[in-house]
């Protein structure tokens, strides 16, 4: 009996040493990357040091691009921009991060951007090629209704649609017409109605593309695809209307890039650009750290990740610098605790993970990890 007890104790000690010595996974934190050319979604688990461990891929469809996660983190939504236009719904395993295919529903058009309202009951889509937005209901089981509740024409080249933090207002950036559409939103019915005024007209040739709202709902930050600037707007929480505050460039002073022009939609022939675009500014995505202290944006022509500090009182941005990153970095995401940032490149065979310095906002490369073809949209989900 004493020998058995001794043996059991030894096994336990060895097992504990093995567990302690292994590279631990950051409890329930996972990265998802849509691979447009492969037609699938890459799954990665985040280790405690911010490194990534590649996992299984989930099948989707050709030109799968924008994604969104439900507020309760139960479901991942991914839209395919190839015909038939569809949204794929997956259940997220909180223990492994694995995606289980639940359903496929038709979408009205090719959407470069999808998002959910704060209740998770409605899916919004913005169509670049058809100049419209749509709203679809979502069931308790996460499935998207086959028929949209609304289809609303907006300005040319709609590129993003999101609610504010209160879930009472919705904004739409239309890149080709230099407009930001302002809506009121009824979360009980999913109905959008034009605010008054219905449109904020930006500066000419700005090309508003993506936007993000501060967590305190005081400011909206809008990325210009064509100028590489981020414009700060104050948000009136009572009326849902925007007022321009300031603007900051995400390009270093020595940059030789020139203002860009709207391009043809993905997945369709589109019209040829008005000139050679090799030296055009082509900004892509922006995100805030959860504490609101830093903002980042990507630019696809010079393959860079720009950093800004944020003045919480005024919303004004100060350009901190630019970091080389993946080739044609269309998408990136920041983990929910603001410790790590992951960037994908449409013309890269890797994705990059960075550590974020919580004091300075500086990013430091942790590592590069295998990616699928045409990697573009990135989502990070944490269950810790």
Regions found by a protein language model. Give the residues of each.
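Short loop/turn segments immediately following beta-strands, especially the blade-tip
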Residues: 44-50, 90-97, 136-143, 183-192, ...
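Short loop/turn segments immediately following the C-termini of beta-strands
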Residues: 36, 81-82, 128, 138, ...
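Beta-rich, blade/repeat-based domains predominating
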Residues: 61-72, 107-122, 151-169, 201-217, ...
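Blade-level signature of beta-propeller repeat domains, shared across WD40, Kelch, NHL, RCC1
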Residues: 346-349, 359, 364-384
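An edge-strand/N-cap motif at the start of beta-rich repeat modules
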Residues: 26-51
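Blade-loop segments of beta-propeller domains
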Residues: 55-120
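A short beta-strand motif characteristic of beta-propeller blades
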Residues: 53-59, 100-105, 147-152, 195-201, ...
């Amino acid at each position: 009996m004493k020998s058995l007890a001794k043996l059991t104790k030894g096994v336990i000690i060895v097992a504990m040493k093995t567990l302690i010595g292994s590279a631990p996974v950051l409890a329930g934190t996972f990265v998802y990357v849509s691979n447009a050319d492969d037609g699938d979604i890459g799954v990665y688990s985040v280790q405690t040091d911010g490194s990534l461990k590649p996992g299984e891929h989930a099948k989707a469809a050709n030109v799968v691009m924008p994604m969104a996660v439900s507020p309760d983190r139960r479901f991942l939504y991914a839209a395919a921009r190839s015909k038939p236009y569809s949204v794929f719904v997956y259940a997220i395993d909180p223990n492994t991060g694995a995606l289980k295919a639940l359903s496929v529903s038709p979408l009205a058009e090719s959407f470069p951007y999808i998002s959910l309202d704060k209740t998770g009951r409605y899916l919004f889509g913005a169509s670049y090629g058809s100049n419209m937005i749509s709203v679809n209901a979502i069931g308790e089981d996460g499935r998207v209704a086959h028929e949209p509740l609304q289809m609303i024409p907006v300005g040319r080249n709609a590129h993003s649609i999101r609610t504010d933090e209160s879930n009472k207002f919705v904004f739409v950036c239309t890149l080709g017409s230099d407009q930001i559409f302002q809506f009121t939103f009824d979360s009980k019915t999913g109905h959008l109605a034009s605010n008054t005024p219905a449109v904020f007209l930006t500066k000419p040739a700005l090309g508003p593309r993506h936007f993000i709202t501060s967590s305190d709902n005081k400011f909206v930050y809008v990325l210009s695809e064509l100028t590489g600037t981020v414009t700060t707007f104050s948000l009136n929480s009572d009326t849902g209307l925007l007022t321009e505050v300031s603007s900051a460039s995400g390009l270093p002073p020595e940059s030789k890039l020139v203002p860009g022009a709207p391009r043809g939609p993905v997945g369709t022939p589109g019209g040829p650009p008005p000139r050679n675009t090799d030296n055009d500014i082509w900004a892509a995505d922006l995100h805030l750290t959860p504490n609101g202290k830093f903002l980042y944006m990507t630019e696809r022509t010079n393959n860079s990740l720009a950093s800004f500090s944020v003045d919480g009182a005024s919303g004004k941005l100060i350009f901190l610098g630019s970091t080389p990153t993946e080739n044609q970095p269309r998408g990136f995401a920041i983990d929910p605790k603001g410790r790590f940032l992951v960037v994908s490149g449409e013309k890269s065979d890797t994705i990059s993970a960075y550590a974020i310095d919580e004091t300075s906002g500086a990013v430091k490369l942790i590592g590069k990890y295998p990616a699928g073809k045409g990697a573009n949209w990135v989502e990070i989900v944490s269950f810790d």
